[in-house]
Amino acid sequence: MRFPLRLTVDLALARLARTWRENAASTSVLLLAPMEPASPSGLDSSALHPMAPRAGTELLARVRNASAPVVWIGGSEPLLHPEMGQLTRCIAGTGRDVFLETDGALLRRRIHEFRPVSRLFLTIQWNGLERSHDVRAGRAGAFQAALEGMRVARLSGFLICVHARVHAETALGEMAESIHFARSLDVDGIVISSANGGSNSANAEATDLQQKIVEARKLIGSKWWESFSRLVGPLVSGQRNTTPGAEAVGVRAERESHANEESVRVA
């Protein structure tokens, strides 16, 4: 499971370009939620009309006005957006690395709208193994639908990334099985983050969750993807513009655990 050299260079350049005042994740990664309207603060929000798709021109303008080399497209199922195929082509065409997160259910139906380029990762969200995933998705067969979407995407030549989300009740053993299963599918990348935004507090439960994430990321088997998970984790788990708390505790723990190892910092 290799980390793209081009993405490594893009992130390194973003790190050099940012000022000391800016947060690494905010300057390296732009989060788009196409099925959610923009809030008054300028961040994507589902507070008003959760399923109102935003115009592709508006989303592309946000990308062009941002310096982030990585664009993570998530929020409410992005494949419900009618222009998603064209939008990803345009974003990748600007030289950005695109991670399109989906539950995978619509991939088979819409895969023909996308192009398998080296800057696009179709990112499948996992909430545990089959039983746990189906329960959290609220429907039987959700996990198998995700696997079928992955199969179709792989046969079509796309790069595949798994976004494994860790819940408070997730057992580390299940995470280990999930990662092992993902690697057996020959995925191109694995990202691990907390589910539902985690917690901004440093209480015992939140700290335990972050420590679980620390341990799970060690199982990825790639320092590059482990570092990338730390970079995008606070954004993709909904923790934007938050005060230091449990996530910071988890990041510090990971840094300390690798203090004596030679590792690559991508952000």
Which ranges hold each PLM region?
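Radical SAM enzyme [4Fe-4S]-AdoMet core and its adjacent flexible, acidic
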Residues: 1, 123-127, 131, 139-245, ...
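Conserved alpha-helical substructure of the radical SAM core
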Residues: 2-113, 117-118
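Short glycine-enriched, charge-decorated loop/helix-capping segments at active-site entrances
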Residues: 46-50, 135-142
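Short glycine-rich, flexible loops that bind phosphorylated cofactors or substrates
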Residues: 80, 131-132
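Short, charged, surface-exposed secondary-structure boundary motifs
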Residues: 110, 132-136
